[in-house]
């Protein structure tokens, strides 16, 4: 037999193994290096979660799961978003309960029964849910390991691209509903691919176990209740599942397979509806069924509601977000799609348009399948005017499979490494990077022991930052002498007026009165001057580096000056009395 071009002599002939050639050793060394690289990046994924990451990507990471569950499970002070009020009920609560809720329940149980009290802290509340998502993210690695050979992809190159992507390191280790959507989409691909054979003549597969169809239907229903946009990702694999082995794929075969999926989907939907109805009901209201996906669609299909969250051009996903998340891999996918389109146009000129665009030609090869898995959801999501980059993170798995073919090396390796290093630095460290450490610092301040004779009231005012997740302060829900005020991107005059109103509270005006009032302002270095204009003396100031706010970016001249560190820091200023 042949190994890397060097023959192995026959033992029966009495010959020994020939020395492997230099090309073979290079290939073996390269494969081993890729495996070591994947192992190192996997370790980095876990360690960086524990460190923890300081970057604050988007408020939805906190306010669609841990902020709500911390209030429900631990009874701490939190800012509940409108989606989780019974009057709105736009988000299903089952996945937040399973991810953040289970983590917080274990923390509460440990604090009540464990030998070391005081385990619950801002750090534990931050890292606990993230660590669970990080563990679940390795299901992506297992899926790529399983999917790569039948998809014509190099297994270890695909795993290296997956583990080295900053999307995996940053987004798949956080409590976004998009993260759950990506995990469910990947498991859907595994179930479908294991029941499909590729080739010029696809034979109808033998009937699989009934649990597989039930599980497939359950995943589709769970994905829909998590985010109704999951259907955009599921349409291609479900079509492949419904037409596998069919001589004439059409409505009949799709309907037959849809009925097979129905029991699992119905059972899963019943669990979600029961959980949501229980969660959003109260003794004062009638116990009606709560259908959170219906409420979600009713809200988001209204253009005026979407406009409140920002409107984007229809090509934002294709022209901007794809490059922002995946860099050169998105460019490779565009190139592959263009080449496939050219082949299709040539075929249509020779055979006719209808035959060339038939289902058999669209899904005739794994590469065509991967292209559809990537571009079909992207096109469907582009129909909506609100387009954020994180909506595309479920596309990572089909993309890395598409960009790591067995017959070719991964191109642009240096560019891929540099792009993901910069992405991890920006979104994992710099972007709003001082806010989470700032909350940890303020947690220590407000929980510091004070003299019983002089109780202290704290006012924590945040301006020009993302919404502060209040559960990280670990404040009791009732009676906490701490007031958290989120001013958002307020004007300078409104900031000064608000500060004056806090310092003129009766308890703060009485010299030697019953309360000692401490006022803290949290602001980026680029907007610190607005606080100075309010004529309050600075009692002390703490800088947390790095912190980059793209809404108020530092000027280039300030970055080139000696004060660049101040402009790239979050400032926590304790104010004295107004002068």
Swiss-Prot record:
InterPro entries: GPI_mannosylTrfase (IPR005599). It is an enzyme of class 2 (transferase). The chain crosses the membrane at residues 131-151, 156-173, 180-200, 216-236, 258-278, 369-389, 391-411, 416-436. Its main location: endoplasmic reticulum. The keyword Transmembrane applies. It is a multi-pass membrane protein. Keywords: Endoplasmic reticulum, Glycosyltransferase, GPI-anchor biosynthesis, Membrane, Transferase, Transmembrane, Transmembrane helix. Pfam families: Glyco_transf_22 (PF03901). The keyword Transferase applies. Widely expressed at low level, with highest level in brain and colon. Coiled coil: none annotated. One of its GO terms (cellular component) is endoplasmic reticulum membrane. GO terms for molecular function: alpha-1,2-mannosyltransferase activity; mannosyltransferase activity. It is found in: Endoplasmic reticulum membrane. Pathway: Glycolipid biosynthesis; glycosylphosphatidylinositol-anchor biosynthesis. It comes from the Eukaryota. GO terms for biological process: GPI anchor biosynthetic process. Alpha-1,2-mannosyltransferase that catalyzes the transfer of the fourth mannose, via an alpha-1,2 bond, from a dolichol-phosphate-mannose (Dol-P-Man) to an alpha-D-Man-(1->2)-alpha-D-Man-(1->6)-2-PEtn-alpha-D-Man-(1->4)-alpha-D-GlcN-(1->6)-(1-radyl,2-acyl-sn-glycero-3-phospho)-2-acyl-inositol (also termed H6) intermediate and participates in the twelfth step of the glycosylphosphatidylinositol-anchor biosynthesis. The presence of a fourth mannose in GPI is facultative, suggesting that it only exists in some tissues. Belongs to the glycosyltransferase 22 family. PIGZ subfamily. This is GPI alpha-1,2-mannosyltransferase 4. The gene is PIGZ.
């Amino acid at each position: 037999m042949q190994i890397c071009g060097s023959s192995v002599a026959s033992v029966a002939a009495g010959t020994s193994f020939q020395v492997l050639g230099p090309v073979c050793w290079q290939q073996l060394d390269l494969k081993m290096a890729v495996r070591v690289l994947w192992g190192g990046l996997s370790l980095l994924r876990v360690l960086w979660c524990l460190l923890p990451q300081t970057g604050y990507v988007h408020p939805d990471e906190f306010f669609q799961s841990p902020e709500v569950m911390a209030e429900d499970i631990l009874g701490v002070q939190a800012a509940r978003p409108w989606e989780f009020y019974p009057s709105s009920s736009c988000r299903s609560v089952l996945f937040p309960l399973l991810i953040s809720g289970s983590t917080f329940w274990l923390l509460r149980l440990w604090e009540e029964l464990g030998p070391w009290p005081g385990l619950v802290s801002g750090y534990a509340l931050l890292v606990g849910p993230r660590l669970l998502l990080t563990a679940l993210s390795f299901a992506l690695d297992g899926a790529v390991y399983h999917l790569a050979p039948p998809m014509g992809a190099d297994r270890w190159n695909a795993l290296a691209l997956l583990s080295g992507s900053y999307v995996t390191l940053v987004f798949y280790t956080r409590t976004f509903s998009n993260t759950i959507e990506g995990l469910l989409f990947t498991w859907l691909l595994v179930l479908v691919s294991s029941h499909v054979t590729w080739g010029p003549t696809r034979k109808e597969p033998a009937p699989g176990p009934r649990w597989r169809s039930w599980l497939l239907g359950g995943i589709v229903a769970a994905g829909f209740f998590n985010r109704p946009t999951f259907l955009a990702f599921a349409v291609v694999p479900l079509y492949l599942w419904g037409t596998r082995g069919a001589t004439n794929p059409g409505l009949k075969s799709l309907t037959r397979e849809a009925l097979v999926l129905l029991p699992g989907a119905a059972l899963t939907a019943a669990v979600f509806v029961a959980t949501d109805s229980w969660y959003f009901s109260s003794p004062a209201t009638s116990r009606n069924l709560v259908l959170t996906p219906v409420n979600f669609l009713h809200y988001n299909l209204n253009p005026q509601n979407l406009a409140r969250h920002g409107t984007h051009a229809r090509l934002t996903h294709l022209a901007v977000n794809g490059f922002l998340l995946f860099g050169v891999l998105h460019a490779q996918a565009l190139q592959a799609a263009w080449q496939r389109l050219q082949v299709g146009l040539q075929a249509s000129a020779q055979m006719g348009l209808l035959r060339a665009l038939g289902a058999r030609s669209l899904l005739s090869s794994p590469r065509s399948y991967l292209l559809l898995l990537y571009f079909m959801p992207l096109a469907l999501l582009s129909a909506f005017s609100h387009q954020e980059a994180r909506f595309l993170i479920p596309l990572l798995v089909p993309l890395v499979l598409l960009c790591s073919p067995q017959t070719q090396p991964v191109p642009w390796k240096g560019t891929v490494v540099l792009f993901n290093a910069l992405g991890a630095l920006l979104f994992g460290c710099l972007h709003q990077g001082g806010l989470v450490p700032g909350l940890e610092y303020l947690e220590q301040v407000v929980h510091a022991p004070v003299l019983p004779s002089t109780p202290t009231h704290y006012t924590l005012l945040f301006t020009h930052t993302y919404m502060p997740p209040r559960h990280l302060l670990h404040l009791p829900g009732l009676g906490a002498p701490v007031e958290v005020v989120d001013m958002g991107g307020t004007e300078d005059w409104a900031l000064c007026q608000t500060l004056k109103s806090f310092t003129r509270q009766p308890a703060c005006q009485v010299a030697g009165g019953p309360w000692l009032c401490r006022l803290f302002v949290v602001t980026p270095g680029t907007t610190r001057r607005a606080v100075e204009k309010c004529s309050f003396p600075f009692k002390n100031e703490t800088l947390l580096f790095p912190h980059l706010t793209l809404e108020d970016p530092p000027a280039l001249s300030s970055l080139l000056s000696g004060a660049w560190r101040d402009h790239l820091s979050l400032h926590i200023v304790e104010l004295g009395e107004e002068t």
